Amino acid sequence: MTTDRTYPIFTVRWLAVHGLAVPTVFFLGSISAMQFIQR
């Protein structure tokens, strides 16, 4: 298992997915909270 060239790509891809997923979940959560507070 000496895949040194695939490992950094997987790491960058993992960081990119989480870097986009975390703000998206937080953004959707804040929108749902605003909708709930307004009503």
From Swiss-Prot:
One of its GO terms (biological process) is photosynthetic electron transport chain. Its cofactor is heme b. Pfam families: Cytochrom_B559. The chain crosses the membrane at residues 14-30. Heme binds at H18. With its partner (PsbE) binds heme. PSII binds additional chlorophylls, carotenoids and specific lipids. Its main location: plastid. This b-type cytochrome is tightly associated with the reaction center of photosystem II (PSII). PSII is a light-driven water:plastoquinone oxidoreductase that uses light energy to abstract electrons from H(2)O, generating O(2) and a proton gradient subsequently used for ATP formation. It consists of a core antenna complex that captures photons, and an electron transfer chain that converts photonic excitation into a charge separation. This is Cytochrome b559 subunit beta.
